[in-house]
Amino acid sequence: MGDRRFIDFQFQDLNSSLRPRLGNATANNTCIVDDSFKYNLNGAVYSVVFILGLITNSASLFVFCFRMKMRSETAIFITNLALSDLLFVCTLPFKIFYNFNRHWPFGDTLCKISGTAFLTNIYGSMLFLTCISVDRFLAIVYPFRSRTIRTRRNSAIVCAGVWILVLSGGISASLFSTTNVNNATTTCFEGFSKRVWKTYLSKITIFIEVVGFIIPLILNVSCSSVVLRTLRKPATLSQIGTNKKKVLKMITVHMAVFVVCFVPYNSVLFLYALVRSQAITNCLLERFAKIMYPITLCLATLNCCFDPFIYYFTLESFQKSFYINTHIRMESLFKTETPLTPKPSLPAIQEEVSDQTTNNGGELMLESTF
């Protein structure tokens, strides 16, 4: 009898020592995770993204629309990417207020619009980056055969398809983004019930992950790998000359933005959806998912600040326009009463910026694409 009591005591002691390691679980198997740090983190990151993203993407759109006039196929993709970033940035003041005050006073409609803008930007950015990567692949690997495919009309059609796809997914997910009132505090885009996750959101998440992340990731990696392999060929090197370094920089920046901003978020989102729908009931994994989700979410929103680097390294005419406009602004700040040198007229500047190359092989692979 004494041995039995000793064994029961040892078993209870072992069970109590293991319980904290499995997470703070209560008697009804619910896992308690404190993720309240996300509000201050999101508010701070959103504030930075709003300031930098608004300035850089507004300036970029001005250059694309009024200086370059979207004369190349790649410029059309990049213009739509900048537009996606700018639309999302314009909704950030509402999110900043919400995260710092932990209260959403703007109503259910703005909550849905804010959620749609976020999803549209994240997955629209990945798809537009994929379009740029595929366009670069066609221009370098098949410079002559791709002439009939790489047209401004086809680029516009592809962009329209991307917008329809991401808006459909964003609106579908945001239909469940209703505001919830708890203790006189209104929340937005959080607090979904387990039933909603199991019935709807888990399926929507899987669809968005496959179409908006896995397929673009495969295409980006594949196209970039083939382009890098093609650049090693002597025939390609003789065509593009010293611009090989520019192409390498462009691919590096492109893949860096994709990997840093989107891979962590989408990887954690998949785990987060499994946890919230209770497909996985391990408390340790649930804690990991709920802690890492807001962190990777902030990384994903930083793409609005990093995308202008892609604009700069992808379009040589964008670099020219950026340099010319910066030079003019600096001259206007420090100009004297009697100008020492005549300034170029605006038509001349526009002509210089929007100059397009001819259709020979080397120029086709560079200026019209990058």
Curated annotation (Swiss-Prot):
Receptor for lysophosphatidic acid (LPA), a mediator of diverse cellular activities. Transduces a signal by increasing the intracellular calcium ions and by stimulating adenylyl cyclase activity. The rank order of potency for agonists of this receptor is 1-oleoyl- > 1-stearoyl- > 1-palmitoyl- > 1-myristoyl- > 1-alkyl- > 1-alkenyl-LPA. Residues 65-73, 134-155, 225-254, 316-370 are cytoplasmic. This is Lysophosphatidic acid receptor 4. Belongs to the G-protein coupled receptor 1 family. Signal peptide: none annotated. It holds the Pfam family 7tm_1. Keywords: Cell membrane, Disulfide bond, G-protein coupled receptor, Glycoprotein, Lipid-binding, Membrane, Receptor, Transducer, Transmembrane, Transmembrane helix. It is a multi-pass membrane protein. Coiled coil: none annotated. Gene3D superfamilies: Rhodopsin 7-helix transmembrane proteins (1.20.1070.10). InterPro entries: GPCR_Rhodpsn, GPCR_Rhodpsn_7TM. The lineage of its organism: Eukaryota, Metazoa, Chordata, Craniata, Vertebrata. The gene is Lpar4. The chain crosses the membrane at residues 44-64, 74-94, 113-133, 156-176, 204-224, 255-275, 295-315. CDD domains: 7tmA_LPAR4. One of its GO terms (cellular component) is nuclear body. Residues 1-43, 95-112, 177-203, 276-294 are extracellular. Glycans are attached at N15, N24, N28, N183. Disulfide bonds join C111-C188. Its main location: membrane. It comes from Mus musculus (Mouse). It is found in: Cell membrane.
